Amino acid sequence: MGVVAGEYRDRDPSWASTGNKGFSASIRVIFVTFGLLVLALSPAAAQAPGEWTPAQARAILDKTQTIRLAPSLAHLSPGERVAVAKLLEVGRIFQDVYEAQRHRNALTVRAALSRRSDAHGRALYTLYRLNQGPIATTLENQRGPFVAVPDAPPGKNVYPWDLTRAELDSYIAAHPAERARLTDLRSVVRRAELAVLKRDLAKLRQYPVLDALHPGLRARIEGLSRKPSRSTLYAVPYSLAYADEMVRSHGLLNEAADAVEPTDWQFARYLRNRARDLLSDDYESGDAAWITGRFKNLNAQIGAYETYDDELLGTRAFYGLSLLATRNQESAALKSAMKGMQELEDSLPTERHKKVIEDIPVGVYDVVADFGQTRGGNTATNLPNEAYLAARYGSTILLRSNIMRNPDIFKGSGDIWGAAMAPAFATHLTADANFYRTLWHEVGHYLGPDLTSAGATLDAIGPDASLLEEMKADLVSLFVAKELRRRGYYTEDQLRSLYASGILRTLQNNRPRREQPYNMMQLMQWNWFLDRKVLAFDPATAKLSVDYGRYHDAVRDLLKQVIALQEAGDRKAAAGFIDRWGSWDDKLHGGVAANIRAQQRYRFRLFEYQALGTAQR
């Protein structure tokens, strides 16, 4: 799980060159409209049918802030620098895969736009980079295509494009033995059409290692090919769906491991294990090496972890890579301060507690480059998400200092706070408070339930599982603050600033869409704080004030309800809770949002990375 920079942006990872010639045929589904043909054939084309006007594109780009991350890598050894180059190459591959996972026409659109030399074409290409695909977020927080392609369905491109939730549920009900495969974290669902089945079999023949690592897969596909049918659904692991890309990434990760092994054998071990994971789709070996390893100057989040993009089932992970340079002194100081995790777990408002590993690997880093799902200003990450891996090995927390402490980003947060709050509270927010709230948000993912009372994973809640998990983590960061103040971890002023940061987190500049887990859970907290009189709204000024004395109890009570919903695993109860607390009042919320929008110079952020040079994409 992760947190993103800036309290106003959409957690949809679309917030925020030409296509890969080796891209698997299985995901090279071309949907060419007349508009795309114009784009592809006319580098200096005028506006094509179906694409946004220059004014529409400019409205977004005028509100887009470019953040350039340029950490010093001078301290790296020669081998580490070679490893960086190899990992950046893997990141570019993952970027292609991620974009193709999210939209079936993405790479075709990107290739066409990259060839445009006219000003409007370049603007559309920047929009593509901002959104990591051809679907944009408007200033009114609506989503839609800005070129002539179909809108993306909830399942994006990891399910059949025309598959509905009703059809999938019906199929699983009729074929319960297929449930695990059809809901698997790292697999693509397909229709059993003969041409598709033949392509999958051809890839298994091309890469015998995949056949060996996935026993029974070839026999299942061969069986389906003897009686193909569009109405039959089947799933293939990511390593087969993106075979060319994963085999190439496997080789590059091993080359990176070779380069770094003389100076950091533990990081090399992680890279080798993760390379193998990309072909097996079982991340345990890599995650174990990642969590238990003590790396020197580099770290990297590599693979498919987060499920935010899957709006159909909420179970499928999307690819990302985050390459990080370690801030060693800060990391060492932070680790020494984080003690007593079991006491914090036992203090949560539930009768069910688990045994936690006290020594959580936590590090402070500078982002070298992000790709795919990790791109767009992630401030921190706590992984892995799978409960059984966290129970066996714990988790690792990655704090991205050059995003969290970026002065331009914090200025945006401070401006939002000033626009929303009464003047008496103007000085209560600090950058350090955001840092510590983010840290303990990530710890919050580690604490609390990771299984329902019946022993099922939290995905039993369905697509709303991510929303509840993110809310739980938010609330844990605020709930444990009182105990951390008692221990001397926070001063009284720091505690107040942390609470202010928790309020900032809830504020919205537009009404969230129901499918936005981050924004919806923030709105729900805002409404809860209003209901419990932690927040008061002045209709005359459209400003908010805070009663800090009510804060802890309000957080405790909401956390208790969220944990209870997770433990129950009741999809309908969760949806009802979200509907109840996710309401929007145009005068109250709309008034505050209008104040925020009025002072916001920027609404979107486009991240660029010095390490990528001129080849930003």
Tell me the role of every PLM-derived stretch.
Residues 28-40:
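Bacterial N-terminal signal peptides
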Residues 48-270:
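N-terminal helix-rich structural modules
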Residues 238-426, 430:
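Contiguous, non-catalytic segments that form substrate-binding/exosite surfaces or channel walls
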Residues 264, 466-483:
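An active-site-proximal "capping" alpha-helix that borders the catalytic cofactor pocket
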Residues 355, 563-617:
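Extended, compositionally biased alpha-helical segments that mediate assembly or anchoring
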Residues 437-450, 473, 478:
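Active-site recognition of the HExxH zinc-binding catalytic motif
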Residues 449-471:
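Post-HEXXH active-site segment of zinc metalloproteases
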Residues 478-574:
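Long, well-structured alpha-helical subdomains associated
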